[in-house]
Amino acid sequence: MFEGLSPLARDARSWPFEQARATIARVLRVRLPDRADQDAAKALIDAGKTDEAVKAYPALAKAVIFETGYGPSGLPHLGTFGEVARTTMVRQAFRALTDEAIPTRLIAFSDDMDGLRKVPDNIENKQPLIEDLGKPLTVVRDPFGTHDSFGAHNNARLRAFLDGFGFEYEFVSSTDCYKGGLFDATLLTALERFDAIQKVMLPTLGEERRATYSPFLPISPSTGKVLQVPTLERNVEKGTIVFEDEDGSKVEVPVTGGHVKMQWKPDWAMRWTALGVDYEMSGKDLIDSVKASGAICKALGGVPPEGFNYELFLDENNQKISKSKGNGLSMEDWLRYGAPESLSYYMFQSPKSAKKLYFDVIPKASDEYLQQLDGFGRQEPAKQLDNPVWHIHGGKPPQQGSPVSFSLMLNLVSAADASTKEILWGFLSRYIPGASPETQPLLDRLAGYAINYYEDFVKPSKVFRAPSDQERAAMLDLLAKLKAMPAGTQDAELIQNEVFEVGKTHGFDPLRAWFQALYEVLLGQSQGPRFGSFAAIFGIDRTVALIEEKLG
């Protein structure tokens, strides 16, 4: 899909391409120790000859690993999804820059062997979780009764959503890696280099924590809980540690085979090393953790991955979105009110800027996505690679957009008091020749989202007001001009110009006060899209009737 794009991708400046270039540099640095080989391979890649670079340097034929991490302690939220979406965009840019001559994998890693530390606020059936506190998430009982464990339930929620978006990824479970032996060799290295890990971690801890900290968290053979206890003895030759169990007895367990897990910063480093991760991004709140894990990764003989720290998502009160609190939008929420493409667009925009993630952002994200999609076909090929829709759709955005914006659709729903898509299509089919749900599938989906959004957010907050004397006079004047137009007029620009002139004639300054008055008096809202577009699609006769009704 991405073959032959490297000449165009070479000059692309959107952030996924910048991250992909940094990843290429890391791959060359790690796999080709000789600087001359690095330079020669880079020259071939820059010249669009990555296939020749791979033939000349077989180390480049190994798959490049892109990873995203997920802690399934609560229900997945859109911030979790955003990391997968953004990492996918970097992976696609990498594939374009290398003409797919270097294989890639995207791992969605679930830290599901972590112990359940607290019961999420937004779960009704809390008792099983209360009783299983401290146990690995894949042992904690599922309060929903649908899966073998709470971790399995939340993993399934994440996978179902990612599958719904069509992401290409490999799901990897921490529990499977620990118990299946994939981490064993690196865990034995960690045991051998215990002191080097402690040298990184202890300065980051308080005095009391330093006294008992161990990078290894044994699983109690008696209670099944993940224990935060000191390591009393280490036996590198046997590959074991000794600790004091909850009943006071001393227990010796191997660090392999799922008998222990690592504290999360050493665990992150161990995972990077064991899996050979080349790229992983993370939130701004983890900057210090990335530094610590990077140092531990080096101590284990690995090389920290490339990546960057993105800004956090905030709820409407500027609080960080939390899986356990369940604040902010859920994945299901967004998909009730907006197209998946609009969500991906939102994730693409300025990842290093803090963003509010709540219901009000959906209409704006939807309309901006539609604008970018509409402009894509008119752009030069080189410019298309920096258009968000190229990244959203894996380089193949749909050729058909939507002739009606989401904001305009919302106003149509409001004016028509439409409760079904069939009612909306009565207006849309007259305004757009040949349009139907079959010929305009995106428009049909937007109609459904707009109805849901209107019913849940717009309708309950509508506040109509009577016009002032100035506004009444202007609306009567507009009424006369609309009545004078030929029946069936659908020229949005013509109507908009008439509305504009009426506002100027009646002395509205600034003119936006005139348009605001129209929406407040006619629709009970403080803002909306261009009034001319609304009147054209709603119909001149219906717009006249609406004005007459509100003027009494």
Swiss-Prot record:
Its annotated compartments are:
Cytoplasm
Find motif ('KMSKS' region) and give its ranges: 320-324
Per its record, what are the GO molecular function terms? Answer: ATP binding; lysine-tRNA ligase activity; tRNA binding
Q: What is its EC number?
A: 6.1.1.6
User: What PROSITE patterns does this protein's entry cite?
Assistant: AA_TRNA_LIGASE_I
The sequence motif named 'HIGH' region is recorded at 72-80
Q: Which residues are ATP-binding?
A: 323
InterPro entries, per database record: aa-tRNA-synth_I_codon-bd_sub2, aa-tRNA-synth_I_CS, aa_tRNA-synth_I_cd-bd_sf, Lys-tRNA-ligase, Rossmann-like_a/b/a_fold
Reactions accelerated catalytically: tRNA(Lys) + L-lysine + ATP = L-lysyl-tRNA(Lys) + AMP + diphosphate
Q: Which UniProt keywords apply?
A: Aminoacyl-tRNA synthetase, ATP-binding, Cytoplasm, Ligase, Nucleotide-binding, Protein biosynthesis
Pfam families associated with the record? tRNA-synt_1f
User: Which Gene Ontology cellular component terms are annotated?
Assistant: cytoplasm
Q: Classify the main location.
A: cytoplasm
Gene3D superfamilies recorded for this chain? 1.10.10.350, HUPs (3.40.50.620)
A biological process from GO: lysyl-tRNA aminoacylation
PANTHER family according to UniProt: LYSINE--TRNA LIGASE (PTHR37940:SF1)
What family does the Swiss-Prot or TrEMBL record give for this protein? Belongs to the class-I aminoacyl-tRNA synthetase family.
Question: What is the protein's given name?
Answer: Lysine--tRNA ligase
Annotated source species: Caulobacter vibrioides (strain NA1000 / CB15N)
What gene name does this entry carry? lysS
